[in-house]
């Protein structure tokens, strides 16, 4: 929808991280929705253009969220942003369909570039 502000969901259990990302993303022109749990995000998925997803969440992990998105057939690009960057986590995230995998702390411009690319109306979606 031309002219519509892209909606980015931030799913992270750490409030300081959510708030910092909210400030950054709003300043960059995104509409931001904050969630502390994967289950809360999944209950409010409608209208989200892209999600920044932590892997280690209470209850439903980031991996669980990715699997739930796939099971629903939800076409929401996922940017994994984790403080626990391991080769296994990277491989599993990308295998689960993450479009970008970034480590905390992340450079603001790196994150914004990924989001602008993935939330653009012309962004290509991977085919199943």
List the predicted regions and their residue ranges.
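Active-site residues of response regulator receiver
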Residues: 54, 82
